[in-house]
């Protein structure tokens, strides 16, 4: 079964000093979750907007549209998501690709640190699913894949951290208009 990726709109007001995101823990799988989870071994975790407690927010991915946030919000959100570096807890969602991309390999789950990068793509790129159709990192050859941790994930985070400095200097609006690639020259790319 292929999960349809649908953006939904949440009206979210951020108070200064509060986090944009939270991590929910799922210890028990309800019947509506069965097709979403990567295996039968909870706990699972999900990065969500702090103000979203809906079941729908757990099922659709990503749970928001970038059009609702200012460039200043997007900059703060990216900074916060980069703090998930090293978080290898298993994401609630199993690996699922969007568009025409299909993945039939053995990997079924990904870590919160990979999810954080994937969410960054969804708030930065207008068509994030063309840039990163599924939460799998690969080397330039496409032969080696990473979804949890390791050298490729570390390289990806280093590239995103450098990219973040670059896009802040450019201005988030200008960088988004130019669709500046976070992984350019890193030796890592998103699986397509």
Residue ranges with predicted function:
Residues 1-25:
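Bacterial Sec-dependent N-terminal signal peptides
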Residues 16-192:
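Extended repeat-based scaffolds of very large eukaryotic assembly and lipid-transport proteins
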């Amino acid at each position: 079964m292929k999960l349809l990726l649908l953006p939904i709109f949440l009206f979210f007001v951020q108070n200064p000093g509060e986090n944009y995101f939270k991590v929910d823990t799922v210890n028990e799988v309800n019947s509506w979750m069965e097709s979403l989870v990567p295996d039968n071994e909870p706990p699972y975790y999900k990065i969500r907007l702090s103000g979203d407690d809906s079941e729908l927010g757990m099922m659709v991915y990503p749970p928001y549209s970038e059009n609702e946030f200012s460039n200043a919000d997007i900059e703060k959100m990216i900074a916060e998501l980069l703090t998930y570096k090293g978080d290898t807890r298993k994401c609630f969602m199993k690996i699922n690709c969007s568009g025409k991309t299909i993945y039939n390999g053995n990997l079924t789950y990904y870590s919160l640190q990979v999810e954080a990068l994937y969410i960054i793509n969804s708030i930065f790129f207008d068509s994030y699913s063309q840039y990163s159709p599924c939460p799998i990192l690969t080397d330039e050859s496409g032969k080696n894949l990473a979804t949890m941790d390791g050298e490729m994930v570390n390289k990806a985070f280093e590239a995103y951290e450098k990219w973040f400095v670059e896009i802040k200097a450019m201005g988030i609006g200008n960088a988004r208009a130019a669709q500046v690639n976070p992984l350019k020259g890193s030796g890592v790319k998103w699986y397509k």
